[in-house]
């Protein structure tokens, strides 16, 4: 039997394969159910136990050699095809399957670029946040509904949570930097809400903060109006009184869109209590803050009727957004 194995090895040493059909014939000949290797293993069962050690080792080496030859010829065949493709300059080029920007990314960067023009710089922070930065420092009283389990994702056995807004970034920045401050903080935020066509447990916000001496509500209105004009074009807007724990006075801005008033921005003058919490003198400095949901604006611009489309990774949907609006 060792002589058979030796003769097969000699045959393998000089074998040459030039096509896919020859390679398949070689595979079946040696590794098929009725192939040479199977026949040898059947014969191996009948030999004397004293010879099995040496013959078994030779058989396994032969099997590995045959499999390696198949892999080698497969590689050479592929390389040959690749070389032909490179050399054949008459063949048509391959179309590249290019991706496209996500609609939320398109809107987010458009907003950022507008505020960059008037001196706002980007500032980011962690999505897992301490209660101090997300609530306490922002003047949320202990009885505020946002502190309840039904509105916020709290992390068990800790004073951490998933941030409910990017205002927490403003607190972190004010703790380490003194006025003048002019920042915007884009990012993901989380609310314990039922997922539906108009709400989601995770969405994106951009919030802004301007802090300096003698900043007034007039400065807030002019900044917001600058954004509206550059983003939406000539539009009819209105400011309505509102309430936020971290601003006083507070307002919401509505835009007339398809003959309906739609709320798109919450804003107001930074509450003096918030400034005291970050060791900034409210008698010397004042400022304003604002925030907007990116999904809401994206739904408006692209006339999309279901927020869930943004998170389903459906290429039929995503491929529609190849250019800036």
Curated annotation (Swiss-Prot):
It comes from the Bacteria. It catalyses: tRNA(Phe) + L-phenylalanine + ATP = L-phenylalanyl-tRNA(Phe) + AMP + diphosphate + H(+). Its EC number is 6.1.1.20. GO terms for cellular component: cytoplasm. GO terms for molecular function: ATP binding; magnesium ion binding; phenylalanine-tRNA ligase activity; tRNA binding. Keywords: Aminoacyl-tRNA synthetase, ATP-binding, Cytoplasm, Ligase, Magnesium, Metal-binding, Nucleotide-binding, Protein biosynthesis. SUPFAM superfamilies: Class II aaRS and biotin synthetases, tRNA-binding arm. Mg(2+) binds at residue 248. Gene3D superfamilies: Bira Bifunctional Protein, Domain 2 (3.30.930.10). GO terms for biological process: phenylalanyl-tRNA aminoacylation. Pfam families: Phe_tRNA-synt_N, tRNA-synt_2d. It is found in: Cytoplasm. InterPro entries: aa-tRNA-synth_II (IPR006195), aa-tRNA-synth_II/BPL/LPL (IPR045864), Phe-tRNA-synth_IIc_asu (IPR004529), Phe-tRNA_ligase_II_N (IPR004188), Phe_tRNA_ligase_alpha1_bac (IPR022911), Phenylalanyl-tRNA_Synthase (IPR002319), tRNA-bd_arm (IPR010978). Transmembrane segments: none annotated. Binds 2 magnesium ions per tetramer. Its cofactor is Mg(2+). Tetramer of two alpha and two beta subunits. Belongs to the class-II aminoacyl-tRNA synthetase family. Phe-tRNA synthetase alpha subunit type 1 subfamily. PANTHER family: PHENYLALANINE--TRNA LIGASE, MITOCHONDRIAL, PHENYLALANYL-TRNA SYNTHETASE. This is Phenylalanine--tRNA ligase alpha subunit. The gene is pheS.
């Amino acid at each position: 039997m060792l002589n058979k194995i030796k003769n097969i090895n000699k045959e393998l040493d000089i074998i040459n394969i030039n096509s896919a059909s020859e390679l398949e014939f070689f595979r079946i000949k040696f590794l098929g159910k009725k192939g040479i290797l199977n026949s040898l293993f059947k014969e191996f069962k009948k030999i004397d136990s004293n010879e099995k050690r040496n013959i078994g080792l030779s058989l396994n080496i032969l099997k590995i050699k045959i499999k390696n030859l198949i892999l080698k010829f497969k590689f050479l065949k592929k390389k040959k095809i690749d070389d032909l493709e490179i050399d054949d300059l008459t063949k048509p080029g391959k179309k590249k399957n290019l991706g496209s920007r996500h609609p939320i990314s398109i809107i987010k960067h458009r907003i950022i670029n507008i505020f960059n023009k008037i001196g706002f710089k980007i500032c980011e922070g962690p999505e897992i946040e301490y209660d101090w930065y997300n609530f306490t420092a922002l003047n949320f009283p202990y009885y505020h509904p946002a502190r309840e389990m039904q509105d916020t994702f709290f992390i068990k056995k800790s004073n951490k949570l998933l941030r409910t807004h990017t205002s927490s970034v403003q607190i972190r920045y004010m703790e380490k930097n003194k006025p003048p401050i002019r920042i915007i903080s884009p990012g993901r935020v989380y609310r314990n809400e039922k997922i539906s066509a108009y709400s989601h447990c995770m969405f994106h916000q951009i919030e802004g903060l301007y802090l300096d001496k003698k900043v007034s509500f007039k400065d807030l209105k002019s900044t917001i109006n600058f954004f509206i004009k550059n983003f939406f074009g000539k539009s009819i807007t209105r400011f309505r009184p509102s309430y936020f724990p971290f601003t006083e006075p507070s307002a919401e801005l509505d835009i007339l869109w398809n003959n309906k008033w739609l709320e798109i921005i919450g804003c107001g003058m930074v509450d003096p209590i918030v400034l005291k919490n970050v060791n900034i003198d409210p008698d010397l400095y004042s400022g304003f803050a604002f925030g907007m949901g990116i999904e809401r604006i994206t739904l408006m611009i692209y006339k999309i009727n279901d927020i869930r489309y943004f998170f389903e990774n459906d290429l039929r949907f995503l491929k529609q957004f190849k250019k800036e609006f």
